[in-house]
């Protein structure tokens, strides 16, 4: 559903379980298909098909509000 950077780890949140991996957000971003996942903040990568709602400031996935960084505005509209 989404990936959150936590210092030198990433937290991978899925429908059923959360995982922690020791890698950078950039490393995991390079492994993901760009048509399915987008980085919307320096600390967050999201699965586009899991977006429940969004506005100019944040995306909602699994009832969690994820901020959209200033440099990433417009990515959601272009991707959907």
Would you name each region that the model predicts?
Residues 28, 75-76:
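DNA major-groove recognition helices of helix-turn-helix
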Residues 1-61:
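Conserved binding/recognition cores within well-folded domains
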Residues 57-60, 67-70, 74:
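C-terminal structural segments of small proteins and small subunits
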Residues 79-80:
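Tandem repeat protein-protein interaction scaffolds
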